A protein has these predicted regions:
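Acidic, surface-exposed loops and disordered segments
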Residues: 1-333
Length: 333
């Protein structure tokens, strides 16, 4: 590689990194503390912290004073907006209600001072939590896993291969939605659920999307649908979370793929590893909101009967599973 080539690559890296910085700085919660979606993310984050505390083996009585006080205040501010998500408020109220009834010790002064505000929120939103916040029993099923269950899961996971030969049969909208519901159960930082997905059925719109991605030549246009997975930067509140959208989006995408696979639908993940100018082309084509970032595309459809897939052998497990020399060390020197 010549010096000029290195310089050009470095320039592209700097330009794209600056673009990422500007987008995260401008649209995350760092500078948009009163944005409705940022407030919603703050509520999700804090009431999940309350939930986590309630699941500990022996929660400290009236733990998390600062978090609880902040959560009640944020819920009040959010509830005064013209538009808000009642489910989020209902779940937060449910978590706070369980918190308030979880301890034998007498309530402290600070809790008594916010009880009136919580009572008002409970009166307005307690009926809105279709999926209650707080905690629940893990359930017997989690303790009844067997070697057979583990083997079935291993067989399922290992059966997945990227499909690049799709039949003409279209995937039903109800099935696509069911796979999204499954993917919604993916882990996300403090349950903030930043991932979004759009489906594009086979046709002009899907083809325009695929033309912007360089890994689908020869098969992309035959897919029943193309999924575009994105992440909402307004769900992230600190500089330390600047990469979290891609972590959560990757987990969501994998579970979306597995949800489709479980229903007989093949997939091929299409990376969106591009520089800022190419990303801008997609944004213009879709009029993508500036607070969303692209995670990946997924070509999907029913495999052709005679479809072939790659072997894609995996590297040795001992290159992936890193074991400490003495089994109990922090350093792998």
């Amino acid at each position: 590689m010549t010096g000029l080539e290195k310089l050009k690559k470095s320039k592209r890296l700097i330009q794209s990194s600056f673009s990422d910085l500007r987008r995260y700085s401008g649209w995350s919660g760092i500078r948009r503390g009163q944005d409705p979606e940022v407030l919603a993310a703050a509520i999700l984050k804090d009431f999940h912290r309350v939930e986590k505390g309630l699941t500990l083996p022996a929660p400290r009585a009236w733990f998390g004073k600062d978090v609880v006080e902040r959560l009640v205040g944020t819920c009040q501010a959010y509830s005064l907006l013209p538009h808000f998500d009642e489910r989020i408020l209902g779940s937060a109220v449910a978590a706070l209600t369980e918190y308030g009834s979880s301890f034998q010790d007498a309530p402290p002064v600070w809790w008594k001072q916010i009880e009136a505000n919580l009572a008002d929120l409970r009166l307005r939103f307690d009926s809105c939590n279709t999926e209650s916040g707080g905690s629940r029993e893990l359930g017997e099923l989690a303790h009844q896993r067997s070697p057979e269950t583990g083997q079935a899961f291993s067989d399922f996971i290992r059966s997945r291969s990227s499909v690049r030969n799709f039949s003409e049969r279209m995937v039903d909208d109800a099935l696509l939605e069911a796979a999204v519901v499954d993917a919604q159960h993916s882990p996300s930082v403090c349950n903030r659920q930043s991932s979004r997905v759009r489906y594009f059925a086979r046709g002009d719109a899907a083809n325009r999307l695929l033309q912007l991605q360089n890994g689908n030549r020869g098969f992309g246009s035959t897919a029943s649908h193309v999924a575009l997975v994105t992440g909402d930067l307004r769900s992230f509140l600190t500089s330390g979370e600047r990469n979290q959208v891609f972590i959560d989006g990757g987990l969501f995408s994998m579970n979306l793929v597995h949800g489709l696979l479980a229903r007989g639908v093949g997939t091929c993940c299409l990376n969106w590893s591009v520089d800022a100018p190419q990303d801008a082309k997609l944004r213009r084509a879709l009029n993508l909101p500036p607070h969303e970032v692209v995670i990946m595309m997924i070509a999907l459809g029913y495999p052709e009967i005679a479809a072939r897939v790659t072997h894609s052998p995996k590297i040795a497990t001992d290159r992936v599973l890193m074991k400490a020399p003495d089994g109990n060390a922090l350093s792998w020197t």
